[in-house]
Amino acid sequence: MTDDKDVLRDVWFGRIPTCFTLYQDEITEREAEPYYLLLPRVSYLTLVTDKVKKHFQKVMRQEDISEIWFEYEGTPLKWHYPIGLLFDLLASSSALPWNITVHFKSFPEKDLLHCPSKDAIEAHFMSCMKEADALKHKSQVINEMQKKDHKQLWMGLQNDRFDQFWAINRKLMEYPAEENGFRYIPFRIYQTTTERPFIQKLFRPVAADGQLHTLGDLLKEVCPSAIDPEDGEKKNQVMIHGIEPMLETPLQWLSEHLSYPDNFLHISIIPQPTD
């Protein structure tokens, strides 16, 4: 991969100032103060909120505590979506800090998966990585790794260790020089305006004539509603990690540098904010 290490670092160390508030109907023994945290964009809510859980459990009776879940403005937050994706999709136009409501009862079974332990997060994360490598390298790279390499990827994410994670992850970002890119680009496109969870299709980074496909090419093919058919300009905000890449950006470069740790490009299509 081309080595723009500063970009990789900026993506990894992206943070969202967040204020956690206990839901008003939760029963407490004394007033629950809000809890503030800088959330890592690349991580998962249930992986980085142990301190939040402990903070609010201190003011609650044990019998009133069941599985923790989070909500933003009435929308339950999916723990298996990366934090940065959740923010971009639901709250990118709101003022900071991001205000998240904490619940300990009435788990929304229809909207959320249960997260009984960090093992569930690890299993989901590794499943995504394996799917991404199946698309990129027919699973050859991830299958040639040892179990300790898989563990190092997970521990790097869990403990927020950039160098530990990228020492292994860089192997997943390589490809034969003669091929100009991966076999297919692992991506998921999310929209708030549809019930469909996300769009995911097979898409090659290089066209048959050898030209590099761009972000604009991807959107025209798999999500044409995001692009104006007349001039090819964006009709919506197209966001990855809180930024709007130019439509001319090669998809291969984006995949190498702006993928989340699960090796997917998580792309949010958001209506343009109205003044």
Swiss-Prot record:
Conjugated to ATG12; which is essential for autophagy, but is not required for association with isolation membrane. GO terms for cellular component: Atg12-Atg5-Atg16 complex; autophagosome; axon; axoneme; cytoplasm; cytosol; glutamatergic synapse; membrane. Keywords: Acetylation, Apoptosis, Autophagy, Cytoplasm, Disease variant, Host-virus interaction, Immunity, Isopeptide bond, Membrane, Neurodegeneration, Ubl conjugation. It is a peripheral membrane protein. It is found in: Cytoplasm; Preautophagosomal structure membrane. The modification N-acetylmethionine is found at residue 1. It comes from the Eukaryota. GO terms for biological process: aggrephagy; antigen processing and presentation of endogenous antigen; autophagosome assembly; autophagy; axonal transport; blood vessel remodeling; cardiac muscle cell apoptotic process; cellular response to nitrogen starvation. Signal peptide: none annotated. Ubiquitous. The mRNA is present at similar levels in viable and apoptotic cells, whereas the protein is dramatically highly expressed in apoptotic cells. One of its GO terms (molecular function) is Atg8-family ligase activity. There is a cross-link at residue 130 (Glycyl lysine isopeptide (Lys-Gly) (interchain with G-Cter in ATG12)). Induction: By apoptotic stimuli. Involved in autophagic vesicle formation. Conjugation with ATG12, through a ubiquitin-like conjugating system involving ATG7 as an E1-like activating enzyme and ATG10 as an E2-like conjugating enzyme, is essential for its function. The ATG12-ATG5 conjugate acts as an E3-like enzyme which is required for lipidation of ATG8 family proteins and their association to the vesicle membranes. Involved in mitochondrial quality control after oxidative damage, and in subsequent cellular longevity. May play an important role in the apoptotic process, possibly within the modified cytoskeleton. Its expression is a relatively late event in the apoptotic process, occurring downstream of caspase activity. Plays a crucial role in IFN-gamma-induced autophagic cell death by interacting with FADD. Belongs to the ATG5 family. It is linked to Spinocerebellar ataxia, autosomal recessive, 25: A form of spinocerebellar ataxia, a clinically and genetically heterogeneous group of cerebellar disorders due to degeneration of the cerebellum with variable involvement of the brainstem and spinal cord. SCAR25 patients manifest delayed psychomotor development with delayed walking, truncal ataxia, dysmetria, and nystagmus, Cerebellar hypoplasia is seen on brain imaging. Forms a conjugate with ATG12. Part of the minor complex composed of 4 sets of ATG12-ATG5 and ATG16L1 (400 kDa); this complex interacts with ATG3 leading to disruption of ATG7 interaction and promotion of ATG8-like proteins lipidation. Forms an 800-kDa complex composed of ATG12-ATG5 and ATG16L2. The ATG12-ATG5 conjugate interacts with RAB33A; this interaction is bridged by ATG16L1 and promotes ATG12-ATG5-ATG16L1 complex recruitment to phagophores. Interacts with TECPR1; the interaction is direct and does not take place when ATG16L1 is associated with the ATG5-ATG12 conjugate. (Microbial infection) Interacts transiently interacts with hepatitis C virus (HCV) protein NS5B during HCV infection. This is Autophagy protein 5. The lineage of its organism: Eukaryota, Metazoa, Chordata, Craniata, Vertebrata. The gene is ATG5.
